Amino acid sequence: MSEHFLVTGGARLTGNVAVTGAKNSVLKLMAAALLAEGTSTITNCPDILDVPLMAEVLRGLGATVELEGDVVRITSPDEPKYDADFAAVRQFRASVCVLGPLVGRCRRAKVALPGGDAIGSRPLDMHQAGLRQLGAECTIEHGCVVAEAKALHGADIHLEFPSVGATENILMAAVLADGVTTIHNAAREPDVVDLCTMLVQMGAEIEGAGTSTLTVTGVSALHPTEHRVIGDRIVAATWGLAAAMTRGDVTVTGVDPEHLQLVLHKLHDAGATVTQSDDGFRVVQYERPKAINVATLPFPGFPTDLQPMAIGLAAIADGTSMITENVFEARFRFVEEMMRLGADARTDGHHAVVRGIRQLSSAPVWSSDIRAGAGLVLAGLVADGVTEVYDVFHIDRGYPLFVENLQSLGAEVERVS
C-alpha cells in the first residue's frame, strides 16, 4: 500500500501557521541563477520535493547546488551544458523554466517535455513562439524542445494568454538579447514580479513588473545575487480556506496579503471575519460557511490552484455555489473524488455546480495533483469518520510540513506508510 494520510474529521482548526517561500517562485529563481556565472544564494526556500528535483536538473546542466535548511546556493559554470537531463525534467512541470535561461546564456537548449500535475493540457506553443521572435529556431524532436539561436535580438511579443511560464521563459532569454523586448499581455502574478526583482538585482533592465506590459533592455552579462523568495500565497490561502471550512480561527504569517485580495474577499463572502496585517491575515469563521461563486482567472483573479479548496468549501456551505474554471480544463477531475465523500456536485464544461450539505462522509480518495490532494485533505477535515487520502506525494511537492502544520492547528491527521 502506498504512503497515504488518515484524516479524522471534526476538529476546529485554531492557532498560528507561518508560510515559507512560494513554490511557484523558487523553482524559476533557481533556474534564473543559470544566467550568471558564479554563486547565487536564494533564501526562504520551501521544504518541498520539487526543490531537490530542480537541483538535480541544474546539476545536470553543470551547476553546483547546495541545499541547507531554507537556503539554496547555486554556482553556475562559465559554460553551462545545454541538454537538460530527461529523467529529471520529466518529473515535474516547472523544469521547463530552464529553457529561457539556456537560450539566453548558451544560445541553445534541449529540454525534455515536462511532466507534473495531471490538470490538463499546458502546451509550450507560446514559449516557442516568443523565443522564435527573439531569433531562436525551436522544434520538438524526440520528446524534447530543441532551441538554437546564432544571436538573440529584441522583439515586440504579444502573448495570446497571460501565461506565467511563457512570460518567464521569454523574460529570461530577453535579458541577454540585443536590444529592447516588449512582452504584451504578460502575466502579472507575484511570482513573475519576484523573478523580475531577482533579475534586476543580477543587472537586468526590466520595466513594468506587475503590469501586463514588460519592457526588457538586453544587457551583455548578468552577475550573481542573493534573493529572498516571497511567501507562498497559495499555501497561505489554503490555511485560510481550511479555517473557514472547519469554523476555525487561524492566523497566517509570512505572506503579503496584497497577493490574495480576491481570495480574502471571497472568504468574507463566505461569512468569515478576515483581518489583515503587513505580514499576513487572520480568518475566523463562527457559523456554517455561506455559498460562494468563484471564477478562476490569471492574477489578480482567483487562482486556479485554489479551485479544489473552493469546491471543498462550497461542498459544506449553506446554499448552491457556482465554480467556473477558466485556466486548466481537466482540473474538475477533483470533483469525482469529492463525490466519493458525498459532495452534491455536477460539472458541465468549465462549470461546477455544488449544492452544500452539512457534512461530508469519509471514504478512500486519490489525489491527482498537488492542489487536489490538499483539497481532499481539507474535505476530510469536515467529513465524519476517517478519510484515507492516497498519492500524497503530490502534496509533498507543494506543501512544506503539511501534516505537521495541520497537527499544530489541532487537526487529527496521520501519515501512514
From Swiss-Prot:
Its main location: cytoplasm. This is UDP-N-acetylglucosamine 1-carboxyvinyltransferase. It holds the Pfam family EPSP_synthase. It catalyses: phosphoenolpyruvate + UDP-N-acetyl-alpha-D-glucosamine = UDP-N-acetyl-3-O-(1-carboxyvinyl)-alpha-D-glucosamine + phosphate. UDP-N-acetyl-alpha-D-glucosamine binds at residues 93, 305, 327. GO terms for cellular component: cytoplasm. Phosphoenolpyruvate binds at residues 23-24. The active site is at 117 (proton donor). It comes from Mycobacteroides abscessus (strain ATCC 19977 / DSM 44196 / CCUG 20993 / CIP 104536 / JCM 13569 / NCTC 13031 / TMC 1543 / L948). CDD domains: UdpNAET. Keywords: Cell cycle, Cell division, Cell shape, Cell wall biogenesis/degradation, Cytoplasm, Peptidoglycan synthesis, Transferase. GO terms for molecular function: UDP-N-acetylglucosamine 1-carboxyvinyltransferase activity. Pathway: Cell wall biogenesis; peptidoglycan biosynthesis.
